[in-house]
Regions:
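Surface-exposed loop/linker segments characteristic of extracytoplasmic
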Residues: 71-159, 198
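Short, glycine/small-hydrophobic-rich surface segments
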Residues: 33, 55-83
Length: 210
């Protein structure tokens, strides 16, 4: 077999093998993206459930004589793209309960006999165009400590809304209305197309004790 015929055979072989190899690679990348989307959705659900649970329990009172009118504090115009933040307090519950880090709420983890949880966005150190969702709570010495719940966050919006409106209209008032709307936007970058995709989750949460 001459050199030319060898080169021709190799070229034809490469031409025949390349399409199925490329197809296999594309399928594997797509499968990886689907797995990453599922994992991201699970992480978003987990973060939103921790936030929703804290909102539902905020304002709990052991005694009717205690005051809870400031146990839910929503702040707007945060440092990252004007994002919102929410601070949540309650009396120490008699039943088993956990904070946003998975710690059991106890007397040591209180200030003035109230538990404390704070959710807000903090700009990412490695990516200035995104933020991390931060959860603050109290340690056993009653001091603040924090943990990251979610990365690549684009916004966190929290508002009191009108629970009697069909579309849960956002209200400008800061006072309790019985229903809070929380929306969280997270960026996901496709590894195949390199295109950014925004994944949003919205929840309406009713505080039980306010």
């Amino acid at each position: 077999m001459t050199l030319l015929s060898c080169i021709t055979a190799l070229t034809l072989g490469a031409v025949m093998i390349y399409p199925p190899l490329k197809l296999l690679n594309d399928v594997m990348l797509k499968h990886l993206e689907i797995e990453q989307d599922i994992l991201l959705a699970q992480n978003i659900n987990r973060a939103m459930e921790l936030l929703a649970r804290a909102i539902r329990e905020a304002g709990y009172r052991v005694s009717q004589n205690s005051i809870n009118e400031h146990d839910i504090q929503i702040k707007q115009d945060g440092l990252f793209k004007g994002s919102a933040a929410i601070a949540l307090m309650q009396d120490l519950p008699k039943h088993l309960a956990y904070d946003c880090m998975g710690n059991v709420l106890s007397k040591e983890r209180t200030r003035q006999q109230k538990t404390y949880q704070h959710f807000y966005l903090e700009r990412s150190r490695n990516d200035l165009q995104s933020a991390s969702l931060i959860c603050q709570s109290l340690d056993r010495k009653g001091q603040l400590h924090q943990a990251e719940l979610l990365n690549q966050v684009q916004y966190l919006r929290i508002h009191w809304v009108n629970p009697q409106a069909i579309n849960a209209t956002i209200l400008t008032s800061k006072g309790p209305t019985g229903l809070i709307r929380v929306s969280l936007g997270v960026r996901r970058t496709s590894k195949t197309t390199k295109v950014n995709k925004l994944i949003e989750q919205v929840r309406w949460v009713a505080p039980r004790h306010i």
